[in-house]
């Protein structure tokens, strides 16, 4: 949840929370980030997009929306140089070597890359964190560049009008400006999605570009496998949202992996051809931000912490936290759902009056009570709508009102115990606590004598499945071994 976004009014209706409880954390509210990280003063790009190209105009129109939807631009000049180096090598052997590209690193933990008409290329820091070497990044970029050179973006533009119409219908049905805007944003993001035939065509072109640029042509199949493995890992990781990941818009059928391998064989047997570029890749991503950014706060196990806002709270055991820019969402067993957000306190009225001001549907006025939570002014109430019961808890800190909405199926006894965990755990952080919070980053280290998979993976932070994630980000199989002098990635502060 962003410190900037929390200051804007987030009209979270009780009905919307019921939808959250029904649909789960991924589909309730899609990510809609505000840009929070400034671009570099001298961004590394292959060339400027031609300003008189109508395709460039299409890309230029969508560019700000794409950037905003993925957390803004990520600032790291050495990483930008890495991606520009890879793109330059691919451009030289592409079907249109005169095509220029504007490369944007996106400040998102999602694993994604895509292209827009006019030579706009995007890659998330999450994808760079998963990749094992430069050839795997090249595999993704060559695939996206193939979409550009094959004019796939022009073909898919015809679908955009239908997306807008569908978004208007969603807005009318949900009777929510926020819902309509989010649906429209999802429609715009589908500009980056292609048909199955276009995907296969881009695969073929991309593998050829890989091999001709001197990269390992088998990297395409290898990274498709890596993304599938990450998807399986994430499917049981409660803190991972896959709604904006590459595989959500790029199907990963086994035949697609085999097709990539088959075309790679034209350059020679696997393991005998092409450069992986691992050393300069690792140099380029050392220190890369991993997971949540400071602007959005951090999820650590069952706890949400936000250093800039100076707050923290816990969710009950067994709940899954999804930290989005506009709110923190959590879902638990039995269709229990929680939403936490904040609004600017512009009127300085009592919190009991605030709860009764009309933003809660189905409010039971007789249940409104003023309370104190860890020394903070607060108020609670109950509400009911259709088959749902709700607890509403609000707290005031300085000029902000923080809001918890908890939903359970009607009559379920877990409403009070769930809300009680939130209320009792919410507190201000001390300046020392806030200062001690640090984001997680990719750290590149060299294996030393006596190091083992167990000892190295034990240094991983931000996950309970240390060995699994360690193997994943280092492309290590069950039978893989390491030796002194090898360079590997870990995740730490």
Model-derived regions: residue spans:
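Bacterial N-terminal signal peptides that target proteins for export
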Residues: 2-15
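A Zn2+-metalloprotease active-site environment signal
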Residues: 11-14, 22-309, 313, 320, ...
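Surface-exposed amphipathic alpha-helical segments
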Residues: 138, 321, 404-442
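Residue-level recognition of short, solvent-exposed, well-ordered loop/turn junctions
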Residues: 200, 314, 448, 477, ...
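Extended non-catalytic domains of envelope/secretory-pathway proteins
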Residues: 318-320, 328-329, 336, 341, ...
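Signature of long, low-cysteine stretches enriched in small and polar/charged residues
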Residues: 339, 356-403
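Primarily a LysM-type cell-wall glycan-binding module
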Residues: 431-464, 486
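Extracellular LysM carbohydrate-binding repeats and other cell-envelope/extracellular binding modules
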Residues: 465-493
């Amino acid at each position: 949840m962003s410190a900037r976004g929390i200051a804007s009014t987030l009209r979270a209706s009780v009905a919307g929370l019921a939808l959250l409880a029904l649909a789960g954390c991924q589909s309730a509210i899609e990510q809609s980030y505000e840009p929070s990280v400034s671009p570099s003063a001298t961004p590394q790009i292959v060339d400027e997009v031609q300003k008189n190209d109508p395709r460039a105009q299409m890309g230029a129109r969508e560019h700000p929306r794409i950037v905003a939807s993925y957390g803004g631009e990520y600032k790291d000049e050495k990483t930008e140089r890495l991606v520009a180096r890879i793109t330059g090598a691919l451009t030289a052997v592409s079907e249109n070597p005169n095509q220029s590209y504007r490369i944007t690193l996106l400040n998102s933990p999602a694993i994604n890359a895509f292209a827009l008409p006019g030579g706009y290329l995007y890659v998330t820091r999450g994808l760079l964190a998963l990749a094992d070497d430069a050839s795997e990044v090249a595999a993704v970029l060559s695939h996206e560049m193939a979409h550009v050179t094959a004019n796939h973006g022009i073909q898919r533009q015809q679908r955009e009008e239908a997306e807008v119409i569908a978004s208007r219908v969603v807005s009318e049905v949900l009777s929510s400006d926020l819902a309509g805007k989010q649906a429209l944003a999802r429609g715009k993001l589908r500009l980056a999605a292609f048909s199955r035939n276009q995907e296969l065509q881009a695969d073929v072109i991309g593998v050829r570009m890989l091999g001709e640029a001197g990269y390992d042509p088998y990297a395409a199949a290898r990274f498709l496998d890596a993304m599938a493995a990450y998807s399986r890992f994430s499917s049981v990781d409660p803190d991972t949202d896959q709604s904006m990941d590459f595989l959500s818009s790029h199907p990963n059928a086994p035949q697609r992996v085999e097709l990539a391998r088959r075309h790679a064989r034209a350059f020679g047997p696997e393991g005998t051809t092409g450069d992986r570029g691992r050393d300069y890749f690792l140099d380029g991503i050392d220190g890369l931000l991993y997971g949540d950014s400071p602007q959005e706060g951090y999820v650590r196990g069952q706890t949400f912490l936000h250093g800039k806002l100076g707050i923290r709270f816990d969710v009950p055991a067994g709940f899954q936290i999804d930290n989005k820019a506009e709110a923190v969402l959590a879902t638990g067993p039995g269709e229990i759902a929680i939403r936490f957000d904040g609004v600017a306190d512009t009127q300085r009225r009592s919190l009991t009056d605030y709860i009764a001001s009309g933003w809660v549907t189905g409010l039971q006025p007789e249940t409104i009570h003023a309370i104190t939570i860890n020394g903070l002014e607060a108020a609670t109430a109950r509400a009911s709508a259709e088959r749902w019961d709700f607890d509403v808890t609000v707290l005031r800190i300085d000029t902000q009102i923080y809001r918890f909405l908890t939903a359970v199926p009607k009559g379920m006894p877990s409403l009070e115990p769930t809300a009680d965990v939130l209320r009792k755990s919410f507190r201000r952080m001390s300046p020392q606590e806030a200062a001690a919070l640090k984001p997680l980053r990719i750290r590149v280290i060299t294996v030393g004598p006596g190091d083992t998979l167990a000892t190295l993976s034990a240094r991983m932070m931000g996950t309970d499945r240390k060995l699994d994630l360690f193997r994943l980000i280092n492309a290590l199989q069950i039978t893989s071994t390491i030796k002194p002098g090898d360079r590997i990635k870990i995740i730490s502060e």
